[in-house]
C-alpha cells in the first residue's frame, strides 16, 4: 500500500489533445484530457480552468466608430440599406487578433454601390482580421462610406452606458473574450482508496486563437496568480533558513529521470480511450472487438498485428498511425519485434 501511494504521488498529470476541428473561421473546437489526477483534483482544476478560459484571456474588439453627419444610433443614411444601429452591430461581430495593448485606429473608405465587408477595413500592421467575409453594410447608391474605427485589446466584456453621441462617435459594446464556451467533465477509475480521475475539457473559440493556445494562456494566467504568493513564501523560508543556519534543498523539474518520464507516459496512455480520439467509429469499433480500448492497449500491437484483425485493412492502420503521430508523437511499430 505504501509503495502504491508513492507511485501515485510521483505521476505527473499531462494534457493531451484528443479532438479538434473548425466548423467555420469563427468557431474552432478542441477537446483535451488531463490525467492522472487524484480524487477531487479534477473538479478543482476544471472549475478554475473554465473561469480562466472565459474571463482571463485577452481579446481584440472594435470599441468605437465615427460616422460623419450622423447624430443618432437609429438614424438612417441615404444610400445604405442598414441603419446606423445595424452597422454598429455588424462591427461588434468582427473578429480580430492583435499582439500589442493600447488603442489602435482603423478606417473604411468605400464608394458604392457594393457590399462592405471586413476585408475593406484598413488596419494597422499589428491587427489581423480572422474572417474577411463578415458583412458590415450594403451600399445601394453611388455614395462614399467613410467610417473611422477604434480598436482595443482587453479581457471580459465592456457594456457601454447610454450617452449623447458627440461628433458622430458611437461606442460599441465589446466582448473581448476569444473563448466562446468551455465545459468540463470528470471520469473516475480505480478501486477503494486508489481512485484517480481524468479531466476532460472542451473549448470553443472565435478563431482568433486556437483552443490549444487558449488552454495554454488560461494555464499561464492561473500560474501568474500564484507566483506572488510563492515568491513571498520563498522569501520567508529564506529568512528562516538564514536565522537557523540551514539550507533548504533546491527542487528542479530537470531532476526527473528519463525512466520516470516514460513511466508517467505509460500511465497516461492507460487512461486515454481510443473512442475519444479522432479515429473513425468503424476503426475503434473493430479495435474494441479485440479488447483494445485505451492507447496503452493499442501500443501493445504492431502494424502487422492490426492487419490480422477482421475488417481492419491497410487504410485503417494508416489512420491509426496518423493519429498516434499527430497527437502523441508515437510511431506504431511495423512488427512485434520493434515493440518497446
Curated annotation (Swiss-Prot):
Instruction: Give Gene Ontology CC terms.
Output: chloroplast; DNA-directed RNA polymerase complex; mitochondrion
Query: Where is it located?
Result: Plastid, Chloroplast
Which segments carry the region annotation Alpha C-terminal domain (alpha-CTD)?
Answer: 268-340
Might you give the EC number(s) for this enzyme?
Answer: 2.7.7.6
Q: Which UniProt keywords apply?
A: Chloroplast, DNA-directed RNA polymerase, Nucleotidyltransferase, Plastid, Transcription, Transferase
Q: Which GO terms describe its molecular function?
A: DNA binding; DNA-directed RNA polymerase activity; protein dimerization activity
One Gene Ontology term of the biological-process aspect is: DNA-templated transcription
Q: Note the Pfam families from the entry.
A: RNA_pol_A_bac, RNA_pol_A_CTD, RNA_pol_L
- Region described as Alpha N-terminal domain (alpha-NTD): spans on this chain: 1-233
Q: Please write the reaction equations for the catalytic activity of this protein.
A: RNA(n) + a ribonucleoside 5'-triphosphate = RNA(n+1) + diphosphate
Q: Which domain of life is it from?
A: Eukaryota
First-listed, main subcellular location of the protein, grouped into a coarse class:
plastid
Q: Could you give the domain comment from the record?
A: The N-terminal domain is essential for RNAP assembly and basal transcription, whereas the C-terminal domain is involved in interaction with transcriptional regulators and with upstream promoter elements.
Would you identify the family this protein belongs to, as annotated?
A: Belongs to the RNA polymerase alpha chain family.
Role: DNA-dependent RNA polymerase catalyzes the transcription of DNA into RNA using the four ribonucleoside triphosphates as substrates.
Q: How does it assemble?
A: In plastids the minimal PEP RNA polymerase catalytic core is composed of four subunits: alpha, beta, beta', and beta''. When a (nuclear-encoded) sigma factor is associated with the core the holoenzyme is formed, which can initiate transcription.
Q: What is this protein called?
A: DNA-directed RNA polymerase subunit alpha
Specify the taxonomic lineage: Eukaryota, Viridiplantae, Streptophyta, Embryophyta, Tracheophyta
Q: Name the gene for this chain.
A: rpoA
Amino acid at each position: 500500500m505504501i509503495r502504491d501511494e508513492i507511485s501515485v504521488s510521483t505521476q505527473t498529470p499531462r494534457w493531451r489533445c484528443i479532438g479538434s476541428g473548425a466548423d467555420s473561421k469563427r468557431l474552432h473546437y478542441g477537446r483535451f484530457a488531463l490525467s492522472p489526477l487524484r480524487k477531487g483534483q479534477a473538479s478543482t482544476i476544471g472549475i478554475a480552468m473554465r473561469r480562466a478560459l472565459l474571463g482571463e484571456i485577452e481579446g481584440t474588439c472594435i470599441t468605437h466608430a465615427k460616422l460623419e453627419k450622423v447624430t443618432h444610433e437609429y438614424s438612417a443614411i441615404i444610400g445604405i440599406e442598414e441603419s446606423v444601429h445595424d452597422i454598429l452591430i455588424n462591427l461588434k461581430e468582427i473578429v480580430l487578433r492583435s499582439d500589442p495593448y493600447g488603442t489602435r485606429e482603423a478606417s473604411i473608405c468605400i464608394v458604392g454601390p457594393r457590399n462592405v465587408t471586413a476585408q475593406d477595413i484598413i488596419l494597422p500592421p499589428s491587427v489581423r482580421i480572422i474572417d474577411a467575409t463578415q458583412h458590415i453594410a450594403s451600399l445601394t447608391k453611388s455614395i462614399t462610406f467613410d467610417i473611422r474605427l477604434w480598436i482595443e485589446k482587453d479581457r471580459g466584456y465592456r457594456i457601454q452606458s447610454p450617452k449623447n453621441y458627440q461628433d458622430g462617435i458611437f461606442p460599441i459594446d465589446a466582448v473581448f473574450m476569444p473563448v466562446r464556451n468551455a465545459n468540463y467533465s470528470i471520469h473516475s477509475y480505480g478501486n477503494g482508496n486508489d481512485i484517480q480521475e481524468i479531466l476532460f475539457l472542451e473549448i470553443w473559440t472565435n478563431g482568433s486563437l486556437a483552443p490549444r493556445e487558449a488552454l495554454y494562456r488560461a494555464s499561464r494566467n492561473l500560474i501568474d496568480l500564484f507566483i506572488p504568493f510563492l515568491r513571498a513564501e520563498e522569501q520567508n523560508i529564506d529568512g528562516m533558513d538564514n536565522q537557523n543556519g540551514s539550507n533548504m534543498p533546491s527542487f528542479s523539474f530537470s531532476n526527473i529521470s528519463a525512466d520516470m518520464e516514460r513511466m508517467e507516459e505509460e500511465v497516461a496512455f492507460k487512461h486515454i480511450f481510443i473512442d475519444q480520439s479522432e479515429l473513425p467509429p468503424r476503426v475503434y469499433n473493430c479495435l474494441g472487438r479485440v479488447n483494445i480500448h485505451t492507447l496503452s492497449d493499442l501500443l501493445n500491437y504492431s502494424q502487422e498485428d492490426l492487419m490480422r484483425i477482421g475488417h481492419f485493412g491497410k487504410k485503417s492502420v494508416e489512420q491509426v498511425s496518423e493519429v498516434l503521430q499527430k497527437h502523441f508523437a508515437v510511431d506504431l511499430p511495423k512488427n512485434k519485434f520493434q515493440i518497446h
